[in-house]
Amino acid sequence: AAELKERLENMGADVDGIWAATFHSACVRILRQDIEELGMGYKSNFTIYDTDDQLKVIKTVMKEHNISDKAVTPKAVQNLISRSKDKLITPDKFSTKGKNGSDDYQLSTAKTIYTDYQARLEAANALDFDDIIMLTVKLFAHCPDVLSHWQNRFKYIMVDEYQDTNAAQYKLV
């Protein structure tokens, strides 16, 4: 992002009003200002959990639910939660149905972990990396005044390597 701004400046552009940011850094900035509008209990001073923090919470949840890491590994659950959030799937929308349409033990177990994991993040006023985009999408969808404010803030949005965006990033733009 800084490199892009530097290139624009070298071309003679006035970069004072330009946001050059990753999806995540732009969304953090938006959430720091407006997350309380969601009414979910998050405060603007939220903490962002890294991969190690996420795994620690997942392992705690698994231990408290007596879920063996032989049945499902914490890393696999973390990846499943991340992929779900990339598709804007919240714990209550998470499907436990396997490919054959019947309940799948591993997916049911993952849903239990995902639900408790997310509750713990909310209780700690914490977001994981995937929440940053998912909650910004939710903020814009549920708070039209906030959406309008940010739409009016930007005349143009340029996305580098747009073909690599996931569903949540696509919805955000």
Regions found by a protein language model. Give the residues of each.
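A basic/glycine-biased coupling hinge at the interface between accessory DNA-binding modules
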Residues: 1-156
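SF2 helicase catalytic motif II
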Residues: 150-169
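Conserved strand-to-helix beginnings and helix N-cap segments that scaffold or border functional pockets
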Residues: 5, 169-170
